[in-house]
């Protein structure tokens, strides 16, 4: 249990996909103008990551990795070379289901997210979580924990940035830094803040 808590906490604070690995930056910068929209996207990312990472874990362990198809009589088969396209396919399918669900039941959030909801499909943070899961050889329970924690970490980062950007509307930002310029500086400072957690031994 302690091991799972370690994975969860590390994925939020120490190995934050947005602020430690700078994954998912396109959506992160584009949708972080309002806290409400950021929270909606953050919840969507949490849901997608919590589902896709363990599903891709099952896909990898029972179909793709070397010897995984021994149950089907193909023990020597190694399908890891199709891993990337397989993970993207799983992510695309789950995002499509989420998109249809939001369109039907929460149309206001669906309209607020706009084009950025389908863009979750190619959000490198989502794909990166699955690739980290494979690289670290997590089992199913660990992958659920890691997927949920990574989603929470990314959502926390985008909501924090949105809150800061809302406050900055009333700040006297130099003309050359207005817009994305000051946002990049803020993201860098936030990254330094999260870097302080790396000193925690877990």
UniProtKB/Swiss-Prot annotation:
One of its GO terms (biological process) is sodium ion transport. It holds the Pfam family Rnf-Nqr. Keywords: Cell inner membrane, Cell membrane, Ion transport, Membrane, NAD, Sodium, Sodium transport, Translocase, Transmembrane, Transmembrane helix, Transport, Ubiquinone. Coiled coil: none annotated. It is a multi-pass membrane protein. Its EC number is 7.2.1.1. One of its GO terms (molecular function) is oxidoreductase activity, acting on NAD(P)H, quinone or similar compound as acceptor. The keyword Hydrolase does not apply. The keyword RNA-binding does not apply. The chain crosses the membrane at residues 11-31, 39-59, 79-99, 114-134, 144-164, 180-200. NQR complex catalyzes the reduction of ubiquinone-1 to ubiquinol by two successive reactions, coupled with the transport of Na(+) ions from the cytoplasm to the periplasm. NqrA to NqrE are probably involved in the second step, the conversion of ubisemiquinone to ubiquinol. NCBIfam families: nqrE. Composed of six subunits; NqrA, NqrB, NqrC, NqrD, NqrE and NqrF. Belongs to the NqrDE/RnfAE family. This is Na(+)-translocating NADH-quinone reductase subunit E. The gene is nqrE.
């Amino acid at each position: 249990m302690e091991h799972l808590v370690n994975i969860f906490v590390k994925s939020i604070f120490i190995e934050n996909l947005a602020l430690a690995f700078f994954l998912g930056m396109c959506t992160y910068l584009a949708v972080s103008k309002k806290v409400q929209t950021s929270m909606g996207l953050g919840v969507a990312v949490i849901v997608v990551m919590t589902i896709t990472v363990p599903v891709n874990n099952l896909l990898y362990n029972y179909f793709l990795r070397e010897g995984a198809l021994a149950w089907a009589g193909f023990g020597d088969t190694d399908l890891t070379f199709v891993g990337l396209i397989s993970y993207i396919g799983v992510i695309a399918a789950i995002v499509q289901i989420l998109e249809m669900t939001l369109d039907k039941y929460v149309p206001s959030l669906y309209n607020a997210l706009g084009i950025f909801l389908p863009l979750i499909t190619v959000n490198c943070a989502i794909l990166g979580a699955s690739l980290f899961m494979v690289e670290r050889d997590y089992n199913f329970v660990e992958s659920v924990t890691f997927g949920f924690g990574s989603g929470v970490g990314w959502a926390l980062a985008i909501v924090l940035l949105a809150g800061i950007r809302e406050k900055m509307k009333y700040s006297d930002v130099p003309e050359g830094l207005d817009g994305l310029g000051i946002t990049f500086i803020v993201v860098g400072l936030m990254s330094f803040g999260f870097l302080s957690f790396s000193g925690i031994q877990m």
